[in-house]
Every structure is written in structure tokens, then in C-alpha cells.
Amino acid sequence: MQHGRITRGFYFEDLPLGTTWLSQGRTLTESDLGTYVNLTWFTEDLFTDQHNRTGNAIGGRPVPALMVMAFSEGLVLHSMDRTGLAFLNVDMDVKSPIYVGDTIYVHCEVIESRATSKPGRGLVRTRNTVTNQHGETVLVYQPLRLYKSREGKTDATSTS
């Protein structure tokens, strides 16, 4: 099953294995970087000193991978609107540097979906592939979330 733009949160039953969707894009700005670095005290020279970044042979103004993941989560938030119950776990793999000025998109695919022993909820793991404006994969993360089921029913038709 493939979904376009998301206008409401998915219920557990909406997310069988193989379901995919794509987020809108988000351009990462200098202001975003400054706000994130100051808010989190992520004061590494690589992110705070534009002119004296030691050992920076990558070019461009890099953005912390955790900031990219946080912004990516914001982009997929609509898929959990009023149906997401908990963020339980995540595995993350940074594939490429991300820079100020890059636009990110999140491609989501359900890779695990199973009912829980408690009625009214189910566990869903997605593979979230973050790409830049050139279609290059920059980050892949696999969050495990707890979703509501419709009308409190649990249907164990999906498996991992």
C-alpha cells in the first residue's frame, strides 16, 4: 500500500508490511542550525565556528545528524497525528554529511507491524530514509512506535 501526502494519523491497521509514504520537504537553514546548537548546547566547533572549523575537509556548513533526525521526525509527525502513543526505540545510520541549505525528504516504509497483547494498540517499525534535494541518502533510521488501533480492536494480520 502506498500513501501520498498524509492528512491524518495512521491507525495500526493502516500500516501493514510494505506500506510507504513520503514527507514534504524541509530546507535546513543557518537559523535552524543556530537555534538547535544553542538549544541543545551542541557547541562543537564544527557547528559553531564557521571560519575556524578544525579538520573540516568536507566543505559547506555541516548540520548535526541528530538535528536532521529531529527535523525528519517533524516531517513524519502527521502520520501519527492523534494515533501515535509512544516512541519506543530507534536505530540510526548516518550515510552522508548534511549541510545548511540542503532540503530533506523522508521516505517511510513499514518493515514490522504486529499487534500487542493489550487490545487497542499495535507496534510498527518503519525504515525512514532521509534524502537530500539531489536524491542522495543522508540518513536512515528505524523507529519503533506504538499506535492506536481503530475502536480498540487488535488485528494481528501483519507480521514482521
Where are these regions (language model features)?
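Short, intrinsically disordered/low-complexity patches at protein termini
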Residues: 45-47, 86-87, 92-93, 123-124, ...
